[in-house]
């Protein structure tokens, strides 16, 4: 089948014939082009139609004609701001900044505001400084004044690092506040104000409470050189060896002469104080051996010959190897980062790169249609190729050449692929094309039933079921029947527009979101399933509904690193719907194998899972055959975390049948 339905291909042909000028095609074709994302930048005349089709189309209009409220809606529906949405947002920045605290929060998360913008917001009382600090304290690098109550309220809600940054930007910070925060919230008082503290006993308590945080550097100079203070800190350091506190060691090195340190600590002084000391590994005491091994990374840096000799000594004496640990003790502090960003990581060979290459080749020599078709074939499953091509900077003749190829793309429905030695029909292309063809019909259906109570629902699919109540109200999740009953209820809820995107503690890890939204899941499957034992997989019966969200509230553009890879909101949510059903299938099977440790009759159980899902969707007379080799594949999935390709194939067959049933094309 063609990737695009016939009416979409016809509309695209008309657009090509009009030299890609969308204003010159009929209004009927314009609406089709908007629905399928077959356009580039848009004219003012199509504003209302485009916004009604998808709010993120706002980014494709000239900024001067855009309504600020539409930009706000677009920001709310995004996870990343691409160059187009960023451009229109910055054009209307002043208006957006006074559109309310929630809009300001979005702009901060998308890095659309500068430090001077934030300073203006605070000075003009548009938003409170505390509100901005709770969003991202590091964004504010200018001096501010806060009351004690405001400071304490902030400290409750921001990380330790943000609190330490707060200390540096406050005009009215005082010793009492810093000590109170340390006492009540265990945040180290690392600020110059601490030097005003002259109570030696209190200073000792603070230094020993935060030995890793270099509080010692802020202690009053008179206290630092007090013999009692020096002795107490030295005793504390000795008490905790072989654990080392670099800041305290540096302090001791600054107040005690090298000769005395070497005499007391000997080989330990190399790691503790970076002093030179030579000795024979054969003369080390047991205590020294333990210390050297624990802190071998220091010796790797400061006395490599000794470190090598010590490793050889341990290998010969104890027949074990001390691994290289250099750099383990380097401490790295990272500021918290927002999930949102204006930065999009570019693939090595993106579509835009390839289009530019084709364009350059056309200018220098004749390029055949076959060559172009071959070089862009890897983007066959991407429903946004047309839009990205039209938005690119290449010559219009090159754009038309590419669009003519894309218009006639077909899914490889009859391609045979070998999966784990099994010859199966490759259905993934067909399913993706089906979703592209019918996503609006499926979305319309899901939203029409999402408010119905499934136990009393009288929709056509529920009326055809043998069992319409919740099956898992009284179930034993240690049995196959219990797992299948819960799966039945989960799937029925999904068919009524309510899904759990976080069933196993991970969101959107299935094959459809991975392929369509450029979600690159490097983690092995067994790592993704790490928290399955304490996840929503334990929920059943009436409690299931509490874990669900309406499909209309599901993440859509927020799945993708690059919103340009998502066709539109409805399409994304339909993909999420089918992807979630596949996740239910995989998670149920994985739970039986790993949590219940039940490997009996695996093939039969997989078959039951697949048919339970179809039955819950009102598909009662379809059969999917499961090959014996599924058992070996699932063993590898559990043991090695490998992707269960054949199980994915079976699951995609299931959603293909369900899609056809919803769309009325079975």
Curated annotation (Swiss-Prot):
It is a single-pass membrane protein. GO terms for cellular component: membrane. InterPro entries: Poxvirus_E2/O1, Poxvirus_O1. It comes from the Viruses. The keyword S-adenosyl-L-methionine does not apply. It is found in: Membrane. Keywords: Early protein, Membrane, Transmembrane, Transmembrane helix. Induction: Expressed in the early phase of the viral replicative cycle. The chain crosses the membrane at residues 574-596. Belongs to the orthopoxvirus OPG074 family. This is Protein OPG074. The lineage of its organism: Viruses, Varidnaviria, Bamfordvirae, Nucleocytoviricota, Pokkesviricetes.
